[in-house]
A protein has these predicted regions:
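Short helix/turn-capping signatures at newly exposed starts of structured segments
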Residues: 1-129
């Protein structure tokens, strides 16, 4: 399992929010596939297998969603994959929202439709506004 660090509102594993797409691709390396998340997407995203990276219309990184084959630590504590109760202890304002758990203050979203976290998203400030 990969082990990455995240800094809420700043970035994940060396990828900073606001970083140009070309730099993100260098930092994460490897193969990627460009895709549109849905018909409302304003830009394409990059699928690196272990994560998806989302971009603003001007190709700046605005969010990174990481999947369960990667361990994410924040301030030296594992935040993902852990159960929702453990995540709530680390993120005080984590609120349930249609199968996801969202922290608007930290721009963090945990996708857990069946109660078990499947992915965690870190976004730039205001991502969930």
């Amino acid at each position: 399992m990969l082990k990455w660090n995240a800094i809420p509102l700043k970035g994940v594993n060396g990828v900073s929010f606001g970083m140009p797409r070309s730099e993100v691709r260098i930092v994460l390396g490897g193969k990627f596939k460009e895709f549109k998340k849905n018909k409302f997407s304003k830009n394409t995203a990059d699928d690196f297998g272990v994560c998806h990276v989302f971009y603003t219309p001007d190709n700046k990184c605005e969010a990174v969603e990481v999947f369960s084959d990667c361990e994410i630590s924040v301030n030296g504590k594992v935040l993902f994959p852990v159960d929702i109760l453990s995540a709530k202890k680390q993120i005080e304002d984590l609120k349930e929202d249609s199968g996801s758990y969202i922290s608007r203050k930290l721009s963090i979203g945990i996708y857990a439709p069946e109660g078990t976290p499947e992915s965690i998203l870190f976004g730039e400030a205001g991502y969930y506004e």
